[in-house]
Design a protein with these regions (language model features):
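Conserved nucleotide-sugar phosphate-binding/catalytic loop shared by glycosyltransferases and other
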Residues: 9, 29-68, 142, 153-156
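Active-site-proximal region of nucleotide-activated glycan assembly enzymes
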Residues: 108-157
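Short His-centered aromatic/hydrophobic patch
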Residues: 91-95
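Short amphipathic alpha-helix
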Residues: 14-26, 46
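Glycosyltransferases and closely related glycan-assembly transferases
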Residues: 77-87, 97-111, 128
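Extreme N-terminal starter segment of soluble prokaryotic enzymes
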Residues: 1-5
Length: 157
């Protein structure tokens, strides 16, 4: 029986980084969760039942973002208990935060990959997940100074 692994990220560059790990999908009972937007709707055709979407939220409209984020948290609880992953792999950002916290509470292993785009400072999600991650991977050696318990994994690309 294959280990259940959840791959989760927000849309855009974070999702692009996450999908670089697709060579791992066949090794696990995998599932992907990302934000739904027009750019990645086609992924349902590629991954079928192996992908689900959370609401896309932008902080540009703070009032609506608060409600969307609350809804995202509720959907996160639903997906976590539906999937019950043993491992959660994420490249960030806010979409992944609630899932990683929930996963940690219920015993999932957390693997966080800090974004390739950041070479010299902590990201907001990195700050949140670093203390609870079972494995925290950085893509730039310079980031080991900022995250001393991290592992340098090289570029995901």
């Amino acid at each position: 029986m294959k280990k259940k692994v959840l791959f989760i990220s927000s849309t855009g560059g974070h999702l692009n980084e996450l999908l670089q790990l697709s060579c791992l999908f066949e090794k696990y009972d995998y599932h992907i969760i990302t934000e739904k937007d027009k750019v990645n709707e086609h992924l349902k055709e590629t991954y079928g039942e192996k992908i689900d979407f959370l609401p896309y939220g932008t902080r540009a409209k703070l009032f609506t973002y608060i409600f969307k984020y609350l809804y995202l948290c509720i959907k996160t609880v639903y997906y976590y208990f539906k999937l019950r992953p043993k491992v959660i792999v994420t490249t960030g950002t806010h979409t992944a935060g609630p899932m990683c916290i929930l996963g940690k509470i219920f015993g999932s292993k957390i693997i966080y990959i800090e974004t390739f785009a950041n070479t010299n400072k902590k990201t907001a999600t990195g700050r949140l997940i670093y203390p609870i991650a079972d494995l925290f991977i950085v893509q730039w050696e310079e980031m080991l100074k900022i995250y001393p318990k991290a592992v340098y994994g090289g570029s995901i690309y």
